[in-house]
């Protein structure tokens, strides 16, 4: 039906006859002539209708926005005064001599020239996707997956599918359950990741596996989370952590170069402990110049219990955060930041404005200055590299509260004060704790229970699980965790030790992971892998801060599809076939 896409018409086609198919993006009737901007997935081109072609001109008078049409015409060069440098096709236009209205459009529920609510956009997603911005995002996503497939193929990876209907296993979030009609009373689970299957593929000898795969987690949603999401899933045999990181870093560096022409350079490596100490986060945004500085050793003997208590507590922390030029903040603004950190459990927010740094105690203004002497103040100013006109905020509480509260404050201040550098800052975060306390006297795996410990024997792990570090690694770009992985456990005794450490009994091990423990008995190779979030990578590469902008048909933050009205009630016959009774009834 067409000879060329709208967005591909250039000055090289001048005087050629072309046929275009697409939609009316905009229509302008200038009396003697009718102009339309005609759009398809590749872009927009200007078409004009002249009364000299009376049949086409008469039909063009009926055109309205979003009519689906076919146009035949001659490519003309625009006069110099009419060249539109903002359009890829801005040097040309189409003089139409043929027009076919393929389908008319009713008045639109969306206005493409205004900002529509997200609810409107999701309800009429098929119209929202016609917007050039949305088409560009999904085309970028397609380019990303195409690049990934080429890279993986060139490096010897096999694209192997794993099951969608599988067994529920404890991986952190809730599973989406699928009832079985054949095995009444039993349920499949949709996979949170292909974790165990990709490990089994390594045990089967496939050596290098990848898959671009849907995963499902029934968890509370945020702006960058969806109940169904897409992973670039990777697993390798006989490679150590450093080799996996090198392979995957080169993939991401190549991706950034290919998609947006940016050289990310070599990724720095930072330990989890250093990231938490300096930034209060295991996914630090290095574009933000502010860092947390520990000062507990200076405050153990002060008379101010808010500082002295955590300073003397092995599980406590006192940290300072210097804000460049922050002394300009008003008391009202400081109170707002104090309210903000309370969300993260902080009981208050002490502060110190630096008027004259070289004057020590005499050169600062602070409600807590009366509890500090000149030597302490000078050391705080020195450690934080404070300058005249700065403000220093203090966090004093448990290590977790200080990291959470001051880490979040660091991000908010950088946004509010425009301190974030406009660049790309990737890194690897490594050496995560193997376990963390669960608040009930036990421990839980920080990543997942199939991650191998770093330089720990089963006996050492059993004796002191909280002392173990995981052989795990996360890739972080501009404060987003874009991928994470680890070396996996490949010995049965270590796997059972980890299961016991997190409170999984022998009986439960056999019930839920018997197939894995059996497989580990038959010459399992050392293996390691990683998974990237495709949605999040696309979000970064397209410059949006909303993951729903890079998914064709996303869910709302309430995990609903406004367009299809999913989820919906099942009818009684369906429920009966599945031997299911529900306590919630559909509205009559």
Curated annotation (Swiss-Prot):
ATP binds at residues 217-219, 226, 481, 533-536. GO terms for biological process: aspartyl-tRNA aminoacylation. L-aspartate binds at residues 171, 217, 447, 488. Catalyzes the attachment of L-aspartate to tRNA(Asp) in a two-step reaction: L-aspartate is first activated by ATP to form Asp-AMP and then transferred to the acceptor end of tRNA(Asp). GO terms for molecular function: aspartate-tRNA ligase activity; ATP binding; nucleic acid binding. One of its GO terms (cellular component) is cytoplasm. Residues 195-198 are annotated as: Aspartate. It is found in: Cytoplasm. This is Aspartate--tRNA ligase. It catalyses: tRNA(Asp) + L-aspartate + ATP = L-aspartyl-tRNA(Asp) + AMP + diphosphate. Belongs to the class-II aminoacyl-tRNA synthetase family. Type 1 subfamily. It is an enzyme of class 6 (ligase). Keywords: Aminoacyl-tRNA synthetase, ATP-binding, Cytoplasm, Ligase, Nucleotide-binding, Protein biosynthesis. Its main location: cytoplasm. Homodimer. The lineage of its organism: Bacteria, Pseudomonadati, Pseudomonadota, Gammaproteobacteria, Aeromonadales. Its EC number is 6.1.1.12.
């Amino acid at each position: 039906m067409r000879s060329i896409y709208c967005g591909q018409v250039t000055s090289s086609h001048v005087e050629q006859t072309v046929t275009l198919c697409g939609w009316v993006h905009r229509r302008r009737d200038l009396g003697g002539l009718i102009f339309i901007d005609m759009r398809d997935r590749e872009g927009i081109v200007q078409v004009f209708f002249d009364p000299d072609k009376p049949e086409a001109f008469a039909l063009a008078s009926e055109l309205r926005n979003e009519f689906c049409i076919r146009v035949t015409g001659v490519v003309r060069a625009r006069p110099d005064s009419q060249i539109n440098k903002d359009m890829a096709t801005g040097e040309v236009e189409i003089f139409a001599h043929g027009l076919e209205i393929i389908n008319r459009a009713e008045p639109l529920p969306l206005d493409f020239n205004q900002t529509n609510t997200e609810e409107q956009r999701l309800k009429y997603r098929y119209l929202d996707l016609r917007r050039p911005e949305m088409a560009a995002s999904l085309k970028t996503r397609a380019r990303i997956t195409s690049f990934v497939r080429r890279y993986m193929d060139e490096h010897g990876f096999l694209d192997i599918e794993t099951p969608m209907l599988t067994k529920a296993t404890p991986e952190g979030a809730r599973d989406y359950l699928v009832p079985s009609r054949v095995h009444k009373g039993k349920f499949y689970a949709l996979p949170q990741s292909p974790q165990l299957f990709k490990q089994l593929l390594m045990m089967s000898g496939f050596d290098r596996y990848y898959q671009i795969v849907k995963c499902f987690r029934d968890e509370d949603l945020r702006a960058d989370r969806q109940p169904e999401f897409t992973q670039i899933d990777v697993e390798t045999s006989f490679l150590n952590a450093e080799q996996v990181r090198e392979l995957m870093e080169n993939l991401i560096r190549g991706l950034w170069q290919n998609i947006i022409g940016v050289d990310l350079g070599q990724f720095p490596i930072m330990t989890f402990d250093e990231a938490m100490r300096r930034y209060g986060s295991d996914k630090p945004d290095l574009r933000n110049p502010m860092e947390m500085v520990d000062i507990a050793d200076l405050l153990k003997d002060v008379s101010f219990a808010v500082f002295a208590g955590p300073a003397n507590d092995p599980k406590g922390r006192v940290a300072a955060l210097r804000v460049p030029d922050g002394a300009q903040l008003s008391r009202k603004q400081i109170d707002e930041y104090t309210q903000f950190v309370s969300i993260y459990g902080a009981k208050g927010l002490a502060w110190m404005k630096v008027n004259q740094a070289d004057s020590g105690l005499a050169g600062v203004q602070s409600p807590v200055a009366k509890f500090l002497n000149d030597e302490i103040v000078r050391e705080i100013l020195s450690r934080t590299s404070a300058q005249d006109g700065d403000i220093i905020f203090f966090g004093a509480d448990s290590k977790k509260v200080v990291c959470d509260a001051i880490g979040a404050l660091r991000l908010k201040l950088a946004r509010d004060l425009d301190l974030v550098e406009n660049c790309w800052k990737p890194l690897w975060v490594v050496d995560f704790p193997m376990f963390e306390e669960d608040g009930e006297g036990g421990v839980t795996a920080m990543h997942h229970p199939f991650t191998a410990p770093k330089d720990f024997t089963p006996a050492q792990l059993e004796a002191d699980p909280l002392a173990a570090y995981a052989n795990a690694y996360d890739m972080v770009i501009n404060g987003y965790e874009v991928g994470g992985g680890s070396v996996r456990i490949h010995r049965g005794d270590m796997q059972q030790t980890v299961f016991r450490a997190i409170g999984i009994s022998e009986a439960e091990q056999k019930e839920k992971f018997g197939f894995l423990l059996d497989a580990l008995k038959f010459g399992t190779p050392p293996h390691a892998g990683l998974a990237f979030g495709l949605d999040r990578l696309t979000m970064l590469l397209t410059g949006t801060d909303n993951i729903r902008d890079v998914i064709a048909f996303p869910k709302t933050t309430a995990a609903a599809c406004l367009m299809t009205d999913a989820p919906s009630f099942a009818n009684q016959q369906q429920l009966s076939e599945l031997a299911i009774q529900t306590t919630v009834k559909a509205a009559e």
